[in-house]
Amino acid sequence: MIEFDNLTYLHGKPQGTGLLKANPEDFVVVEDLGFEPDGEGEHILVRILKNGCNTRFVADALAKFLKIHAREVSFAGQKDKHAVTEQWLCARVPGKEMPELSAFQLEGCQVLEYARHKRKLRLGALKGNAFTLVLREVSNRDDVEQRLIDICVKGVPNYFGAQRFGIGGSNLQGALRWAQTNTPVRDRNKRSFWLSAARSALFNQIVAERLKKADVNQVVDGDALQLAGRGSWFVATTEELAELQRRVNDKELMITAALPGSGEWGTQREALAFEQAAVAAETELQALLVREKVEAARRAMLLYPQQLSWNWWDDVTVEIRFWLPAGSFATSVVRELINTTGDYAHIAE
């Protein structure tokens, strides 16, 4: 299995180095749910600004403040502790008057707004995230500048970030140990983390191998394509390749790679043979996903950061802004820019 740091680059290995997250203010994330609170209902959506607090810790503190069980507070995604983040929490408080949430106090946290909502906020129920990153001590400004220009046109590999695999790859190692035994894993969080790490590693491997062929954006017979921003896909046939290639070039369609699991992967013929060969050595992880009935799915191989802009504060410091859809990783953008001395594994998804 290819380690995250050794995955194939789309724009070649960066020539320069830089520092990611010298302080929390260098990594700002603003969650975009894609909808507004309903204004009524048994749930309360709370938008919180936090610095130095992880999401679960804040959710538990909010539950204590509201005198409800911790399981009654949900969120769409984990946000990094060592960053400045805005995100929504959702508390189920039925049949009660609206609590005065402006009185909620927690060091490093501030309630920005809150309103009633009809539905529980579930994990993954967000449109995306807006990022403002500051890279410091950049050793090669010209290289980073050109890479930013290239990323605007060609995007970056849509890799799952190193944080998906845990500190030191602990989640992937757990999955491998589990795959080698039939011992049940009772802890639901461990099950989720380990299965997610296994499937993500296989996806990354397929994309890395496709990049080695230099045809990551070239449609081949049997590729599974999806409309940009959509989840469903269809299979490319030889007769359609020219027209489909035009639509891929126009970023109307995205070529996908497998998220292996039980059931058919989605590709056929040449594309399927390539994907199977790319992960042929990882029989244990594939068997684990099938055994645990994790359904196969698809994910776009390339990621195009939206609203990408940047500003050089000086020759060694650059502020970069962009928006990514849910499930994408800012660190997969950064790794195409610099060889960073920051720690990816400590950046929450």
UniProtKB/Swiss-Prot annotation:
Belongs to the pseudouridine synthase TruD family. CDD domains: PseudoU_synth_EcTruD (cd02575). It catalyses: uridine(13) in tRNA = pseudouridine(13) in tRNA. Substrate binds at F27, N129, F329. NCBIfam families: PRK00984.1-4, tRNA_TruD_broad. Its EC number is 5.4.99.27. Keywords: Isomerase, tRNA processing. This is tRNA pseudouridine synthase D. It comes from the Bacteria. One of its GO terms (cellular component) is cytosol. PANTHER family: TRNA PSEUDOURIDINE SYNTHASE D. Gene3D superfamilies: TruD, catalytic domain, TruD, insertion domain. Residues 155-303 form the TRUD domain. It comes from Escherichia coli (strain 55989 / EAEC).
